[in-house]
């Protein structure tokens, strides 16, 4: 019913922003996989609110509790359940918004669909729902690393009109985590922070683009026709809060090229190995990974909840003016980086198991 994702490596998330807690049940993880629990917590710390001056001041520890599925930090092959308790929530900040719809937020459409909505904290539409995704994604990352030394890295490419030109082939995690905006170019990162602070002082918000790569992805992942790898990646990433666009490889810029310019020529690399001279395909051809670097980008809109006066309506359809209260990110992108990585890792882990299930007998 909309809260589960994946086929064989499957997650189901639960909880609301201002409820008792949020979490995930992960099914299908292979048994006997050694899990670094500290690495799960480290990923949640990257997503955590209150981590810097450009994120929401909501102060949550986001300490993960693993309730099942592990013994001595090894997977049992049974469902892994993880939960994070909500501590610092203030429902009174949302009293005015109980019956007033925030423009471009999920309040209005949730009310249309269900006849009721959790206005306090945004309920299931809150980014706190992604805690479960990030926790499960941390396990997916460890599985991918164990099987194929696969690495998933994302960074902030653009904030509003400020864009960084980052070489996907050379970017490293230490460069991404060297500043609070998670842009590996330190000079551009400084400008991005200044822009976020500027819009925040004005009671406004801004969006941008996150770029993500997969190094050393297993070749052969993805299935024709409706389960193409990029199709599942698009669904995964477009399910994230505030996401508004997805592209892979050359993306929309590829439409300006001719076929002779865009085609990735194959180069001799030995039997059973495909290598290309260029990578306009972004590591996926015909919906199946070819082993080259997977390169994708996700666009995120400006945060919907802002402190400026906005015209809106209430649940009775009457015109109202709303200046939202509560604690919100002026820009979601710095905290969305681990969310993007997690969803990509979950898709790859799922397709890895599906590939083994269908084709593993002959490999």
Swiss-Prot record:
Q: Which cofactors does the annotated protein need, by name?
A: FMNH2
* Source organism superkingdom: Bacteria
Q: Where does the chain bind FMN?
A: 124-126, 286, 301-305, 327
Which chemical reaction does it catalyze? Answer: 5-O-(1-carboxyvinyl)-3-phosphoshikimate = chorismate + phosphate
**Keyword NADP attributed:** yes
Q: Which UniProt keywords apply?
A: Amino-acid biosynthesis, Aromatic amino acid biosynthesis, FAD, Flavoprotein, FMN, Lyase, NADP
Query: What binding details are noted for the cofactor?
Result: Reduced FMN (FMNH(2)).
Please state the pathway this protein functions in, per its UniProt record.
Answer: Metabolic intermediate biosynthesis; chorismate biosynthesis; chorismate from D-erythrose 4-phosphate and phosphoenolpyruvate: step 7/7
* Entry-linked InterPro entries: Chorismate_synth (IPR000453), Chorismate_synth_AroC_sf (IPR035904), Chorismate_synthase_CS (IPR020541)
Gene Ontology CC terms? cytosol
- EC numbers: 4.2.3.5
The record's Gene Ontology biological-process terms are: amino acid biosynthetic process; aromatic amino acid family biosynthetic process; chorismate biosynthetic process
- Binding of NADP(+) occurs at 47
Q: Which Gene3D superfamilies match?
A: Chorismate synthase AroC (3.60.150.10)
| A matching Pfam family | Chorismate_synt
Any GO MF annotation of the entry: FMN binding
Cite the record's note on assembly.
Homotetramer.
Please report which protein family the annotation says this sequence is part of.
Answer: Belongs to the chorismate synthase family.
Q: What does this protein do?
A: This reaction introduces a second double bond into the aromatic ring system.
Q: What is this protein called?
A: Chorismate synthase
Native species: Prochlorococcus marinus (strain MIT 9211)
């Amino acid at each position: 019913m909309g809260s589960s994702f994946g086929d064989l490596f499957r997650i189901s998330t639960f909880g609301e922003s201002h409820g008792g807690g949020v979490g995930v049940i992960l099914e299908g993880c292979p048994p006997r996989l050694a899990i670094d629990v500290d690495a799960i917590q480290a990923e949640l710390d990257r997503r955590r609110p209150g981590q810097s001056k450009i994120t929401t001041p909501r102060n949550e520890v986001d300490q993960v509790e693993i309730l099942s599925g592990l013994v001595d930090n090894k997977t049992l092959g049974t469902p892994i359940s993880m939960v994070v308790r909500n501590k610092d929530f203030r429902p009174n900040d949302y009293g005015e918004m109980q019956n007033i719809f925030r423009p471009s937020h999920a309040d209005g459409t949730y009310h249309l669909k269900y006849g009721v909505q959790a206005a306090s904290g945004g309920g299931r539409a809150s980014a706190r729902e992604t805690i479960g995704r990030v926790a499960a994604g941390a396990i997916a990352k460890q599985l991918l690393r164990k099987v194929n030394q696969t690495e998933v890295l994302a960074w902030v490419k653009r904030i509003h009109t400020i864009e960084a030109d980052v070489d996907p082939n050379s970017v490293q995690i230490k460069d991404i985590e060297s500043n609070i905006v998670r842009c590996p170019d330190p000079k551009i990162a400084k400008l991005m922070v200044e822009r976020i602070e500027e819009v925040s002082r004005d009671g406004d918000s801004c969006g941008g683009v996150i770029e993500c790569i997969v190094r050393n992805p297993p070749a052969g992942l993805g299935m024709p026709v409706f389960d193409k790898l990029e199709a599942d990646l698009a669904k995964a990433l477009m399910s994230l809060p505030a996401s508004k666009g997805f592209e892979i490889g050359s993306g929309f810029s590829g439409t300006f090229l001719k076929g002779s310019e865009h085609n990735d020529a194959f180069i001799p690399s030995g039997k059973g190995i495909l290598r290309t001279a260029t990578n306009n395909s972004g590591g996926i051809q015909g919906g199946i990974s070819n082993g080259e670097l997977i390169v994708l980008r996700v666009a995120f809109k400006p945060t919907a909840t802002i402190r400026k006066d906005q015209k809106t309506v209430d649940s009775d359809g009457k015109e109202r003016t709303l200046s939202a209260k509560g604690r919100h990110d002026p820009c979601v992108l710095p905290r969305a980086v681990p969310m993007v990585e997690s969803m990509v890792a979950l898709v790859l882990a799922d397709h890895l198991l599906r590939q083994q299930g269908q084709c593993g007998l002959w490999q």
